[in-house]
C-alpha cells in the first residue's frame, strides 16, 4: 500500500510539473474596437511570448505557474495582467495622448551629458560587475535620461523606450522596460524597477554548449534556484541554510526550519506556497564560494566560504510552481544577491537539466 501511494504521489508530481494552460484573447483599440495586429504579448522575465494575428487574436501556452502577462502596442498604453490558469482575455488598449507626448518638459535636474558622466556607474549597478555581467551591453544608451537631485544627493535614471541588451555569455537578447533606477549616495542604497523579456540567440552547437554551461553557472546559487528549491522542499539538499535574526538583536541570527508552519504554508487549492518571516533572514548558499570580484568589491577576506544574502519581507510572499513569486515589491534584499543584477539573471522559465 505504501509503495502504491508513493507511486501515485510521483505520478501526480510529474503531472503537475508538466501541466500547461492556455491564454487566449483579442486585442483591440478601446475607442474604435478595431483589432490591433502584431500587438506584443509576453510574460515578464521569461522567453514566453507571441503576437496577435491580423484580426487581433492570440494564443499562448504556458507551463504551470504564475506570470505577469504584458500586452503592448506602439502608441498605446500597455496592460499588465497576472495569469495562473487558462483564460480568455478581451483586451482594449488605450491610445497615448500624442499631444501630451509631444510636450517635452526639461527638468532642471536632468544631466545634459548623463551617459558620459554616469553611464559606467549605471551599468555597474544595473547590469552588474561579475565577469558574466561584464559581457552584457546596452545597445540603445540614448534612450536613457539621467537626473541628479542635489538636495537629496541621489541619481535617478529613466528610459524613454525599452532598453535593448545583448548578452553573449548567456545567449540572450533582453528587452528591458526600465521604470526607474535610483541611487542614494548618502547610504549607497539603490533600487530599480522594470520588467524584461528574453529572446534566445541563434548559435552553432559549440556555442549552445557554452551557453548551456554558463546558464547553469548563473542558476546555481541564484534567487531563481532558491525559489525553485523552496517550492520543491529541497532547500537543505541543495545547500541552502536560512537563519532568522534573533529578537532584540541587530546582529545575531539563529538557524530555523524553513518548513516550520510558523513561516511556511501550503495552499493546496492553488498549488502555491506562502512564506513569511517576522524579522530579517540570512540566506546562505553553501555549494559555491563568493566570486573574487564580489570579495574585492565588498572588501571581504579571500577565505570567505559562502554566498550570503539578507532578506526583509514587508508582507508574506506567495511562490508558484515555476518559481515566480508575488508581490515582488515586498521582497527587499541585501548582500550577495544585490551584487547579482540584470547581467547575471536568467528568464524565470529557465529549466536546469
Predicted regions and their residues:
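Bacterial Sec-dependent N-terminal signal peptides
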Residues: 1-26, 41
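Short, acidic Ser/Thr/Gly-rich low-complexity loop/linker segments typical of extracellular
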Residues: 46-57
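Short, ordered, surface-exposed loop/turn motifs in non-cytosolic proteins
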Residues: 23, 30-45, 64
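Surface-exposed, low-complexity/disordered segments
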Residues: 89, 93-353
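Hydrophobic beta-strand segments
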Residues: 39-43, 69, 105
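A short, solvent-exposed loop/turn motif at the edges and junctions
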Residues: 43, 70-81
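A short, amphipathic beta-strand motif
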Residues: 23-29, 56-58, 91, 103
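Structured interaction patches on ligand/partner-binding surfaces of diverse proteins
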Residues: 50, 77-89
Amino acid at each position: 500500500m505504501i509503495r502504491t501511494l508513493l507511486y501515485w504521489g510521483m505520478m501526480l508530481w510529474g503531472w503537475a510539473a508538466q501541466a500547461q494552460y492556455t491564454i487566449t484573447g483579442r486585442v483591440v483599440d478601446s475607442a474604435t474596437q478595431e483589432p490591433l495586429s502584431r500587438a506584443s504579448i509576453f510574460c515578464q522575465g521569461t522567453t514566453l511570448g507571441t503576437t496577435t494575428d491580423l484580426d487581433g487574436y492570440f494564443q499562448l501556452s504556458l507551463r504551470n505557474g504564475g506570470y505577469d502577462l504584458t500586452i503592448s502596442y506602439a502608441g498605446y498604453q500597455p496592460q499588465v495582467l497576472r495569469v495562473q490558469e487558462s483564460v480568455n482575455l478581451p483586451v482594449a488598449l488605450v491610445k497615448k495622448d500624442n499631444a501630451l507626448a509631444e510636450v517635452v518638459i526639461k527638468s532642471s535636474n536632468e544631466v545634459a551629458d548623463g551617459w558620459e558622466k554616469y553611464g559606467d556607474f549605471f551599468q555597474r549597478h544595473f547590469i552588474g560587475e561579475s565577469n558574466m555581467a561584464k559581457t552584457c551591453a546596452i545597445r540603445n544608451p540614448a534612450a536613457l535620461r539621467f537626473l541628479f537631485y542635489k538636495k537629496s544627493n541621489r541619481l535617478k535614471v529613466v528610459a524613454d523606450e525599452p532598453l535593448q541588451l545583448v548578452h553573449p555569455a548567456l545567449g540572450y537578447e533582453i528587452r528591458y522596460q526600465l521604470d526607474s533606477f535610483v541611487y542614494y549616495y548618502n547610504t549607497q542604497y539603490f533600487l530599480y524597477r522594470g520588467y524584461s523579456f528574453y529572446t534566445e540567440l541563434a548559435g552553432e552547437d559549440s556555442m549552445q554548449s557554452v551557453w548551456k554551461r554558463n546558464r547553469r553557472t548563473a542558476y546555481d546559487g541564484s534567487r531563481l534556484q532558491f525559489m525553485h528549491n523552496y517550492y520543491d522542499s529541497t532547500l537543505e539538499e541543495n545547500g541552502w541554510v536560512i537563519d532568522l535574526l534573533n529578537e532584540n538583536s541587530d546582529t545575531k541570527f539563529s538557524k530555523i526550519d524553513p518548513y516550520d508552519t510558523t513561516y511556511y504554508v501550503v495552499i493546496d487549492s492553488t498549488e502555491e506556497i506562502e512564506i513569511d518571516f517576522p524579522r530579517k533572514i540570512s540566506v546562505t548558499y553553501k555549494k559555491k564560494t563568493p566570486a573574487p570580484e564580489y570579495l574585492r568589491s565588498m572588501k571581504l577576506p579571500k577565505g570567505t566560504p559562502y554566498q550570503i544574502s539578507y532578506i526583509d519581507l514587508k508582507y508574506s510572499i506567495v511562490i508558484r510552481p515555476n518559481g515566480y513569486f508575488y508581490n515582488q515589491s515586498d521582497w527587499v534584499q541585501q548582500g550577495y544577491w544585490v551584487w547579482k543584477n540584470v547581467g547575471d539573471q536568467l528568464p524565470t522559465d529557465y529549466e536546469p537539466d
